[in-house]
């Protein structure tokens, strides 16, 4: 299999079931996006012209046929995002490409120029507060020293393997409430070396991979993959007094 950054992230996530991992990354099972994910995909489509895979998502209209506040808020934020990109001198070169090398695969949001210089950009829409800390919430965008930046490493490494050039990686993050952050990820050679070692470790670990059930009622009851090894009842907590 060709390695994606999400495959590595989920493989080493203790709360991600091994059976689900096999279904998603080996067998091609596609999970349905949550409402929050749908909002993010619609925001991408409105802002840069496409979401991943070119799929279109829509928010149901009200009974009157008019757009809901949820839809109007996304439209308003996307217009702000487009103006922000213009103000930052960001120009789109390629939107939602699929990149492949001999061993890696990736789907960056956009190849761009920033003030005339080629770069990679990931566009984010989030409902978290501006000052919410990455230390406690992996989806937050404050206290960035705690953020997992393997996504940036993966795409920068891929582009280097494809084109022989290291590009700057940017996150352009828009909060549902209207805040915005433009983050440049300055990747050191040691960070890239560490990521290449992680790729080698992943390849080695994959050889001994066994799709074992996670045995967690909390996780299994929400899982869309109805395997015959799922935990159907709450786990027993034993206590001796």
Task: Name what the model sees in each region.
Residues 1-108:
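Metal-dependent nuclease catalytic cores that hydrolyze phosphodiester bonds in DNA/RNA
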Residues 97-98, 115, 123-126, 174-177:
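Histidine- and/or cysteine-centered catalytic micro-motif in compact active-site loops
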Residues 103-105, 118, 179-182:
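Short, mixed charged/polar active-site loops
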Residues 86-89, 112-120, 159-167:
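Secondary-structure boundary elements
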Residues 57, 131-133, 168-172:
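Short acidic alpha-helical/loop segments enriched in Asp/Glu that coordinate divalent cations
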């Amino acid at each position: 299999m060709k390695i994606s950054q999400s495959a590595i992230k989920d493989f080493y996530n203790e709360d991600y079931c091994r059976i689900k991992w096999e279904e998603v990354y080996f067998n091609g099972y596609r999970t349905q996006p949550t409402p929050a994910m749908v909002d993010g995909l619609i925001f991408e489509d409105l802002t840069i012209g496409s979401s991943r895979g070119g799929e279109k998502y829509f928010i149901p209209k009200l009974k009157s046929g008019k757009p809901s506040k949820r839809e109007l808020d996304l439209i308003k934020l996307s217009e702000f995002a487009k103006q922000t990109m213009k103000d930052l001198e960001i120009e789109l070169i390629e939107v939602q490409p699929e990149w492949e090398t001999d061993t890696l695969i990736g789907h960056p949001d956009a190849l761009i120029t920033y003030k005339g210089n080629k770069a990679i950009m990931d566009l984010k829409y989030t409902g978290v507060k501006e000052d919410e800390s990455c230390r406690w919430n992996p989806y937050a965008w404050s206290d960035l020293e705690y953020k997992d930046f393997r996504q940036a490493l993966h795409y920068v490494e891929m582009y280097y393997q494809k084109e022989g050039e290291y590009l700057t990686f940017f996150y352009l993050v828009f909060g549902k409430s209207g805040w915005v952050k433009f983050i440049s990820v300055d990747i050191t050679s040691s960070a890239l070396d560490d990521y290449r070692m992680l790729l080698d470790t992943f390849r080695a670990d994959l050889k001994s991979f066994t799709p074992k059930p996670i045995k967690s009622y909390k996780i299994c009851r929400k899982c869309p993959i109805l395997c015959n090894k799922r935990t159907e009842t709450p786990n027993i907590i034993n206590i001796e007094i």
